[in-house]
């Protein structure tokens, strides 16, 4: 399993539908980049300048909204993930 370092978070991105409500197929270059995902793994937290560690606010299993230009795409064991910094997460979905 991927284990993120520091304040990084591994997400399984929730893919968008490939068809519109009217049944029209949307070209891949016309689709918006997904901005929601499920937290798969969380690092140990950010370290401040004074050496203190700030615990992550998100937890494994939570669904989150993140900045659409955030992170790095990673392929691991045939699955695609997104590794982002915790501060690129905008909200937790209840």
UniProtKB/Swiss-Prot annotation:
Belongs to the GroES chaperonin family. Keywords: Chaperone, Cytoplasm. Gene3D superfamilies: GroES chaperonin. GO terms for cellular component: cytoplasm. One of its GO terms (molecular function) is metal ion binding. This is Co-chaperonin GroES. GO terms for biological process: chaperone cofactor-dependent protein refolding. It comes from Ligilactobacillus salivarius (strain UCC118). It holds the Pfam family Cpn10. Together with the chaperonin GroEL, plays an essential role in assisting protein folding. The GroEL-GroES system forms a nano-cage that allows encapsulation of the non-native substrate proteins and provides a physical environment optimized to promote and accelerate protein folding. GroES binds to the apical surface of the GroEL ring, thereby capping the opening of the GroEL channel. It is found in: Cytoplasm. Coiled coil: none annotated. InterPro entries: Chaperonin_GroES (IPR020818), Chaperonin_GroES_sf (IPR037124), Chaprnonin_Cpn10_CS (IPR018369), GroES-like_sf (IPR011032). CDD domains: cpn10. Heptamer of 7 subunits arranged in a ring. Interacts with the chaperonin GroEL. It comes from the Bacteria.
């Amino acid at each position: 399993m991927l284990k993120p370092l520091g304040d990084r978070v591994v997400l399984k991105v929730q893919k968008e539908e490939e068809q519109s409500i009217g049944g029209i197929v949307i070209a891949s270059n016309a689709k918006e980049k997904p901005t929601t995902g499920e937290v798969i793994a969380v690092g140990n937290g950010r370290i401040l300048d004074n050496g203190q560690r700030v615990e992550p606010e998100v937890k494994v299993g939570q669904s989150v909204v993140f900045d659409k230009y955030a992170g790095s795409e990673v392929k691991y064991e045939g699955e695609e993930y997104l590794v982002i910094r915790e501060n690129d997460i905008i909200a937790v979905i209840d």
